[in-house]
Amino acid sequence: MDSELIKGTLSLIILSLLSRRAMYGYEIVTTVKEETDGVLEWKAGSLYPSLHKLEKDGMIRGQWEGDPDSRRRKFYQLTEAGRTALAEKEESWSQLCAAICQIMEKSE
């Protein structure tokens, strides 16, 4: 899969997953891999910078959870600004997909 193409969809996918429920980083990575039958397989190196940017931009909020004596995880959840951004990104994505499909159909 073209990594440049995937980069443009990271925030859309992250926001979409977090609209379901709060998740921690590794859980996002495994969910993406499972739900795409391995087509999308992210490394932490690409996920965490996106999570940090979304958090800085106020789209998501992170909260550490777990026993201080054991493994703690940072769970991310969507904010209201994130819900608004997700709706806008979904609309843009739908328009883009439709436009690309039109071009591809005419090329056949």
Label each region the model flagged.
Residues 9, 13, 77, 99:
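Amphipathic alpha-helical recognition patches that constitute DNA-binding helices
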Residues 1-3, 64-65:
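Short beta-strand/turn micro-motifs at beta-sheet edges
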Residues 55-72, 77:
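Beta-hairpin "wing" of winged helix-turn-helix
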Residues 2-46:
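N-terminal helix-turn-helix DNA-binding core of bacterial DNA-binding proteins
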Residues 84-108:
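Amphipathic alpha-helical dimerization/coiled-coil segments
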Residues 13-16, 30, 52, 87, ...:
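A cross-family signal for key residues in well-ordered alpha-helices
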Residues 47-54:
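Basic amphipathic alpha-helical segments that dock to polyanions
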